[in-house]
């Protein structure tokens, strides 16, 4: 059976196998409906037009893999499985961390789409996980677009989650979940950036919905939870001082691992002379940063300066420069 609480079950990658097996082996619509039901509210499931969207779902992507070192010390992929519009490729770097690139061949997400990533990183492994291009959230009819990612990090590993930015178009609806499962000596650096309409293109988001959640576990205990929700006229709401102060770009950075207090002091020292608007603090062993901007180049420049503080353990993905 598929349980309703994704964030609890997502710590076990078998959940993804159960879900996908149910979804792809369904021989009747009732089987299909039962498999996908945990990701939608009862109200959504009862709408006839939404039921039609479920039957005619545009994209269902799935990546499930394990990354670790071979006997000769080279990072490689084990147990690689992918379906639908999602692909994963490992790029080796000689002087930087190797990169696992998630590719969405559909070119974005829209109503009813569902993307699932389940990635396990073995102990003593350094890895950058990123995406090939910016994710685009297109206009949705009734159902939300869905993106779920589960990352398990082994002991003494350095793993970063640095996808390219997510662009939110007018009418976009997104439910996104990022679940991180750490061991005692795991090190994790995560970045998520949202762009509400491209100002250079004159785009505004007059209607939309975002339901975004990050949860970090260590040794199966909840360490940090962050939920961001906004609905309605997003362009109007982001003008409020307690929301985005008129900025349309919002970036969240988290780090948990070794030398966290040292990094915090260096970041706060950097903040004194920085031109960027951001805040930093440590909550329950997790270093948090929130950055606001109107130009994506400011965010990227900031992140470029930020990763230098962490030394050789983390670096910006090379694909960001293409």
Language-model region placement:
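N-terminal, charged/glycine-rich beta-strand/loop interface patches
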Residues: 2-155, 159-165, 170, 308, ...
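A structural signal for small-residue-enriched, beta-sheet-centric alpha/beta enzyme cores
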Residues: 19-27, 31-33, 194, 198-322
């Amino acid at each position: 059976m598929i349980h309703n609480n994704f964030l609890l079950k997502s710590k076990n990658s078998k959940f993804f196998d159960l879900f996908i097996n149910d979804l792809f082996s369904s021989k009747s619509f009732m089987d299909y409906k039962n498999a996908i039901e945990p990701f939608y509210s009862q109200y959504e499931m009862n709408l006839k037009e939404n039921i039609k969207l479920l039957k005619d779902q545009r994209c269902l992507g799935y990546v499930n893999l394990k990354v670790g070192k071979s006997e000769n010390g080279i990072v490689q992929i084990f147990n690689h499985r992918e379906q639908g519009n999602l692909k994963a490729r490992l790029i080796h770097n000689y002087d930087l961390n190797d990169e696992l690139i998630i590719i969405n061949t559909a070119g974005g997400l829209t109503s009813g789409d569902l993307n699932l990533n389940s990635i396990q990183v073995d102990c003593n492994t350094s890895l950058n996980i990123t995406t090939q291009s910016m994710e685009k959230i297109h206009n949705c009819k009734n159902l939300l677009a869905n993106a779920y990612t589960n990352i398990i990090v082994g002991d003494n590993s350095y793993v970063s989650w640095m996808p390219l930015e997510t662009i939110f178009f007018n009418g976009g609806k997104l439910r996104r979940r990022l679940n991180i499962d750490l061991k005692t000596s795991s090190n994790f650096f995560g970045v998520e950036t949202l762009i509400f309409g491209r100002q250079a293109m004159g785009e505004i988001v007059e209607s939309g919905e975002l339901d975004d959640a990050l949860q970090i576990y260590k040794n199966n205990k909840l360490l940090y939870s962050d939920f961001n929700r906004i609905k309605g006229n997003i362009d109007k709401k982001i003008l409020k001082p307690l929301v985005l102060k008129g900025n349309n770009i919002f970036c969240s950075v988290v780090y948990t691992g070794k030398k966290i207090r040292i990094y915090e002091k260096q970041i706060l020292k950097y903040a004194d002379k920085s031109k960027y608007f951001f805040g930093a603090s440590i909550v329950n062993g997790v270093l948090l940063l929130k950055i606001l901007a109107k130009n994506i180049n400011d965010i990227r420049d900031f992140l470029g300066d930020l990763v230098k503080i962490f030394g050789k353990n983390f670096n910006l993905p090379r694909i960001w420069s293409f």
